[in-house]
Amino acid sequence: MIGPPGSGKSMLAARLPGLLPMLDGEAARGSAAVLSLVGQFRPEAFGVRPYRQPHHTASAVALVGGGNPPRPGEISLAHHGVLFLDELPEFDRKVLETLREPLESGHIHIARAARHARFPAEFQLVAAMNPCPCGYSGHGNGKCRCTPDQIARYRGRISGPFLDRIDLLIEVPAVPVDALDGTGDGESSATVRSRVEAALARQRERQGKANSRLTAKEVDTLCQPDDSGAGLLKQASVRLGLSARAWHRVLKVARTIADLAGSASIRAPHVAEAIQYRRLSGG
């Protein structure tokens, strides 16, 4: 999420666990087991998806794990839950790069001297950042005085390969003052959660796991859009220069959008929405 200070990025991230289904069976036990390793498991929270928000000064060991003996880091403590990285460009770039492996594999392997450990790390990564160093680029108040070079250097702190592993990039605009005292007409968390539960049930019935865990080969089999959707994706691939990884990730997002809509097939509108979420990254 990219937006100015006070636009609600942190609040949106904190609400995400409430939109996800409760953990059950093996997933709940797996999450509890990791938390127990660092003495943070609470019986009353069994089945609740963890939400972790490490500070941007966190070291690589704090984030991915380490030590002697090896201990799980924040990515493993967020297993089956949400890992929120606020002020993303403020994290050390080398620290962020350590996330690339677990984002793909769902686990992290740690080797320290004669000690080796493999911890699970299937987490939902959510990140937030300002659009520029001062935070007000594009804001209607005209406060921003950042130069194009300063903005480019700020955004350049996040590598292309890291961004390539993020499926949804969205702008969160500032909330108008006259909208702050309104109640709004959006859906409740319970309504959205019911739709998410139904979509996840479809995925498990179809392939035995969530769309996010599909391999590239499985995506080619299970996430093919109809003719109009396929044509749209090919056009976007050329225009945006999508990598092979980005291509498969767009298909997984489109499959998920279709599942949320209750559609058995992936149609052009589903593909168009999935492509839209990658436009900020340029592919």
What are these regions (language model features)?
Residues 70, 93-283:
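Basic, amphipathic alpha-helical bundle interface domains used for macromolecular binding and assembly
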Residues 1-158:
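Conserved ASCE/P-loop NTPase catalytic core
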